[in-house]
Amino acid sequence: MVKNILFKVLFCFFCNQIFLFDLNPYENYYSSKPTGSVKETLEKISENSWKISSFGKHPLFTIKQESIFSIDNGNVILESGFRKLDVLGGLRKDHQTYKVEKEGDQKIIVYSFGKKKGSIEIEENFYDNLTLQIQIKMNYLKKDEFKINYFDKGKIKIKSFLNKKEEIIYKSKPVEVFEFTEQREDKRYFKFLIRNDSDKETIKVFQGGRGFNVDWELD
């Protein structure tokens, strides 16, 4: 019995060493040519509750996002969030909110998207724009490809990613990164680079589609 307990303790310890990184508060700034900027902040708001938020300005759009989440056995548990995206000065808007509630044994996402309101039952963990990368840093750095649940506009979708290690020049120095590329069937693209060190910072983000291409870099 003692051996079994010791094995479980060692197994959990080494799993944590392999799959987890230290989640610490931060304030990061990203820029995009010619005048784009993003401020992203991670705050610890209670013993096991975190808030990640970002505010971005670009000639094509402005975006404000916030997510509240906790961590359970190396998994991000998204509790609530919102996104306010205004394109071309408000010509197109994407405003949405979501919150996880319990109804008996069920977990429900209560959401609003524009004028639409609704709720759906959830059975698995899911992520939004901000928590997706945190979960990937915790569990998917060693996987060459994977699928992950993503919540957007009242629906849970499945995103597929490829992951490979690359060496790039960043701030005039060679840096090893994990390069994550979303697999899509349309003409949009999304890719981000995570530095392979203890902090696991996202140092570059590439996104685009019909009529726009935006590259962000950590200042």
Task: Describe every region a protein language model picked out.
Residues 4, 135-137, 174, 202:
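Generic hydrophobic, helix-prone segments enriched in Leu/Val/Ile
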Residues 90-136:
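Hydrophobic, well-structured mid-protein blocks that either form specific transmembrane helices
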Residues 2-22:
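Classical Sec-dependent N-terminal signal peptides that target proteins to the secretory pathway
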Residues 21-101, 142-219:
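Acidic, serine/threonine-rich low-complexity disordered tracts
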Residues 10-12, 130-138, 159, 197:
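Intrinsically disordered, low-complexity segments enriched in Ser/Pro/Gly/Ala and basic residues
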Residues 11, 118-121, 146-147:
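Short helix-to-loop capping/linker segments positioned immediately adjacent to catalytic or ligand/cofactor-binding
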Residues 6, 11, 47, 102-106, ...:
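Intrinsically disordered, low-complexity segments enriched in glycine/proline and serine/threonine
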